[in-house]
Each structure stands twice: as structure tokens, then as C-alpha cells.
A protein has these predicted regions:
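PLP-dependent amino-acid enzyme catalytic core
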Residues: 1-428
Length: 428
């Protein structure tokens, strides 16, 4: 597999290099040189396969012979050890539930596949994973790499800005997992990660790698569950499918669009954000004008500078698709709460991120179409807000209950690169 740097097309790397480096020169994102396509017949045959076999086939179309098919399938089996069911919400709407993994969030798919790829590629060489999280990435990455040999993980998150339960899920592990609470917002955490990757000495000394959705292995893994969703739908739904994606860093939407590029029958995608609406405003008036990030109920989408957006634009350019074909919506907290109550009346308990996606979908779905929205996290991960909004008590899944009373093992740091650098060098 060959990939190129979106900021410098002359920088071309293999899949192994892209996974290991994370980012290219000048913080450029890597993008596949070849965009494989399956025929309609091939797609129909693939949709009959089981999740793991089909996923290995999809991933192999990108990765090629860099990783033998047998090993790839084995690694996919280890990564995707849980289902991605479509729950029936209304006669014309389903929710693709991506929260049945160990940390109850969609990022388990990408995090675990990346961990499998990195450990396969690195062999015995030590690696340090440095990533920023607004919640779910931290937990997924921590659990995906926890206890794996030759890997150290450093996770930055905005202090006081993620739910207490989310914090417990990844800040209580210890071992090879180091968690750092930063005085600042998610964008401040992202900025520190970028500074670290610009520091050549630090990069080489620690074998730095990033594990957020910019890593190509995570992005490729996310393509697979779109196929799994379609495989569960009846033929008439497949023919008129509209997918609404709750969007923060836009990795999930990028993966969905790559699935469509492979030949998956999706009529239309909707990018659903909260009031951090840089992309909806851009799609509306063509002006890219990020505003200060605002805290919302759907906190994993509190991102005003989505770092996967260049990949979306590149895919549209390569496929000669029109950006105006992409649906969009920005949903405020009041509407999010109202939507969660509406979903509850339909018999479906949801959380803020999925509610944003459902609202955008319901408002834009036409008669005869089938709508799918992504459920990216278990409602219990947002227990306090969900209970307050719905006026009922949620049972804690065992994954959360087991960690609820454990002590936090995080360091507190200012949003200052020198302080972070010192901590990382001291904790090699």
C-alpha cells in the first residue's frame, strides 16, 4: 500500500511507515494513493460473509501484500471481538450500535486494530503512543494497548471537561498507561500533541506515534463497520440508504465516505455536529472560519478545528464528487435534550452524540429512504446527563461498574509543552 502526505504529495510512504509515523512532514495527513473499488457483484458476495472475514477482505484491498492475508485476518479477529448490531428505532430508521466493545465506544474498533497493526509492525522496537482525547479515544487506546509489550501510552485530556465515568475508564489502569489532565480545552491538548511531534529529539528518543483518528490504521478499521451495518439491512433499505454521522474530528465520516468509494451502496451522508459547527457553516457558505470551541452535552464533538477534514476534501476531489452532495446539520443542546426524550418515547435510550445524529437524520430523511444513525457510545458513559435529561436511572454496564471506585492515577499539568516534555522524558 502506498500513501501520500496531503501537504506534500512527494512524500510517499508504505502502510507500515504511515502507521508508525502517524503524521507526515508539516503535520500532513496520509491518504491512500490507490482507492480500490469493488464491483456490485463483489459487494453482494462480501455482504454475505461474517464480520471478521469481510473486514479482512476490505482491509486487504488497501493494505495489499504488506501484511499476509492470514496474519491480517488473525489480527482483525483479535481486534473485532465484539458485534456492531443495527438496532431498530423506527420502521425507516436504525441505529448502528458501535458501543459493544470493552470501552463501550466506537473507538474500540479503530484503537484495537491500530494496536494490533502497530505491535505487528514494530516487533521488538519500543513505541510511545501520544494522543489527545475528548473522552472516548483515551479509553479505547488505553484498553487496546494495555499490557502489550514494548508500548508506552501517554494520553492528554482536558481537565474537568470529560465525564467522571469516562475518566475512570482510562485513568485507573496504570501499568504502561500514563494519563495527563491538562488545564485547557481539547484543542489545547491537540496543540500539545502537535508540538511533541514537531520535536525531533523527543520523537526519536521515545519512538513517538499518535493514536487519534489521524492514524491511517484507525481510519481503515472504521470503514468495516459501515459494511457490517449494510449487511444487516433488507435489500429495500440498502437501495435508499442515508447515513447520519455524529462528527467531531470527522474520522468517522471520512471512513463512511471511503466505504462509499469502495462501492458500498450509500445514497447520502449527513455530517451532524453540535454548535461547534465549523463544517456545517463551511458547507453552507464556503467560508472556513472556526470559532472558539464551546462546551456542550455531546462533549466528544466539541472540536472547532476537525483534523480529518482535509481527507474528506481530498476524497471528494479524487472521486470528482461535489461537496454540496454532503448533508449537514448543527444541533444545539436544547434540541439534543428534546431529541433524547423523543427517542425514549420511541423505546430507545440514547445519549447526546447519537441524538445529534438522529435529529439531523430525522429532519432530512425523505419518504422511501431508510436512515441509519451511528450510536458511538453507550448511554451509561454519559450517565449523569442522560439520567438528568430522561429522569430515570441507568444501570452501569460491568465495564464501567468495575472501575467506578478505583482511584484516578492522572498527572495534572498546565497547557505548557515544556512541562509535558519533561514528564515524558522522565517517564521513559
Amino acid at each position: 500500500m502506498k500513501l501520500y502526505n496531503l501537504k506534500d504529495h512527494n512524500e510517499q510512504v508504505s502502510f507500515a511507515q504511515a502507521v508508525t509515523q502517524g503524521l507526515g512532514k508539516n503535520q500532513g495527513l496520509f491518504f491512500p494513493h490507490d482507492l480500490p473499488e469493488f464491483s456490485l457483484t463483489e459487494i453482494d458476495e462480501m455482504l454475505k460473509l461474517d464480520f471478521v472475514t469481510r473486514s479482512a477482505k476490505i482491509l486487504s484491498a488497501f493494505i495489499g501484500d504488506e501484511i499476509p492475508q492470514e496474519i491480517l485476518e488473525e489480527r482483525v479477529r483479535a481486534a473485532f471481538a465484539f458485534p456492531a448490531p443495527v438496532a431498530n428505532v423506527e420502521s425507516d430508521v436504525g441505529c448502528l450500535e458501535l458501543f459493544h466493545g470493552p470501552t463501550l465506544a466506537f473507538k474500540d474498533f479503530g484503537g484495537r486494530f491500530m494496536a494490533q497493526m502497530l505491535t505487528h509492525i514494530a516487533g521488538d522496537k519500543p513505541v510511545t503512543i501520544l494522543t489527545a482525547t475528548s473522552g472516548d479515544t483515551g479509553a479505547a487506546v488505553a484498553h487496546a494497548f494495555y499490557g502489550l509489550p514494548n508500548v508506552k501510552v501517554v494520553i492528554l485530556y482536558p481537565r474537568g471537561k470529560i465525564s467522571p465515568l469516562q475518566e475512570k475508564l482510562f485513568c485507573t489502569l496504570g501499568g504502561n498507561i500514563e494519563t495527563v489532565a491538562i488545564d485547557g480545552d481539547f484543542d489545547a491538548c491537540q496543540a500539545l500533541v502537535k508540538q511533541a511531534f514537531d520535536d525531533e529529539e523527543l520523537k526519536v528518543a521515545l519512538g513517538l506515534n499518535s493514536a487519534n483518528s489521524i492514524n491511517i490504521s484507525r481510519l481503515l478499521a472504521q470503514i468495516c463497520y459501515y459494511f457490517e451495518a449494510v449487511a444487516q439491512l433488507p435489500q429495500e433499505a440498502r437501495n435508499q440508504l442515508v447515513v447520519s454521522v455524529p462528527s467531531g474530528n470527522f474520522g468517522d465520516l471520512t471512513a463512511g465516505l471511503l466505504a462509499k468509494s469502495l462501492g458500498l451502496p450509500v445514497k447520502h451522508f449527513i455530517a451532524a455536529t453540535n454548535v461547534n459547527d465549523t463544517v456545517p457553516r463551511f458547507l453552507h457558505d464556503g467560508q472556513w472560519s472556526p470559532k472558539a470551541t464551546q462546551a456542550t452535552l455531546s462533549n466528544a464533538m466539541d472540536v472547532s478545528q476537525p483534523n480529518n477534514w482535509p481527507r474528506v476534501e481530498e476524497l471528494f476531489r479524487r472521486k470528482i464528487w461535489q461537496l454540496k452532495e454532503l448533508g449537514y446539520a448543527a444541533v444545539d443542546d436544547e434540541t439534543t435534550q428534546q431529541t433524547m426524550r423523543e427517542l425514549k418515547e420511541l423505546g430507545y435510550t440514547s445519549e447526546p452524540h447519537a441524538a445529534v445524529a438522529y435529529r439531523a437524520l430525522r429532519d432530512q430523511l425523505h419518504p422511501g429512504e431508510y436512515g441509519l444513525f451511528l450510536g458511538t457510545a453507550h448511554p451509561a458513559k454519559f450517565k449523569e446527563s442522560v439520567e438528568a435529561i430522561l429522569g430515570e436511572t441507568l444501570d452501569l454496564p460491568k465495564e464501567l461498574a468495575e472501575r467506578a471506585d478505583l482511584p484516578l492515577l492522572s498527572h495534572n499539568l498546565p497547557a505548557d509543552f515544556a512541562a509535558l516534555r519533561k514528564l515524558m522524558m522522565n517517564h521513559q
